[in-house]
Amino acid sequence: MLNMGFENNSDTFAIILRPALFKDKQAGDNYLNNTPATVFRITPNKSTKLDPYNYPELKVRGTGKTEFDLMDDLEQLRNAILNKYNDLNATELPTSIAVPSGSDAIQRGIDALGPDNDACYLWTSTRTPNLPTSPFPNLSQYYDFMPNPAITLGNATNEFIIVYGVNHVATGKATYENFVLYGADAWNGVGAIHDTEFNGTAEEYLPDNPNAKYLYVYKIARNCNGDPHCFEVPTGPGAYGIGLDQPLFIAWRSYLEKATKTGPSYSEIVYDRAIKFDPKK
């Protein structure tokens, strides 16, 4: 399925590593700051008969066990969040699958943005992108997939986003999960919140619910005012931040269900959610 070569119809491909949560932070920094390998492109001097690898046997997603028993608890959490901030305007953001599977995208000639079979991808959008593959994606085309009007984050005291949902690591559906805030103009991720920071965050809202340990709540704001469960969004410099009037979106990644050793099944997880709050006019 990989069409290598130099012709106009040859594929461009990449191998991407996304390390996180190093046990030894200094060793991790050393690894990131010093390229640990070199990649060579080797072209034979003589033409040879192709002997391509077979398509690998895929690990099957899903166990039949779902997170849907937590739907009532999640609705209680939603109501608790809305009640806590009932003096503010609340806009509930949509959630959908962020990318199609790689094999689906290859067969349809659409850009799947490099998905991994070992993960589930969600984002705050109404639908999954299905744009044609091109050498240099025009990210403005993705505006059609964003909420309308666009979601921005100003610096007003009572303007923020609450991200909440089921902690897929706590339920056993993933071994690692995060969410990332992106600027929609350049798809610049400005910060990732990992599942290690989810623990205990829902108990404040559901103190008497024993299933609160399977849920999480996290705040995104311009000024967190000391809140330990809050990500403070920078405005720059450049792609290191998101402007006050720049549209944004949130994306979630959940990796590797232990029982299957591949990505969770979308049909077995409860989708993560987000609510934008701002002052009532």
Language-model features and meaning:
Residues 1-281:
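A compositional/structural signature for long, glycine/proline-rich flexible linkers
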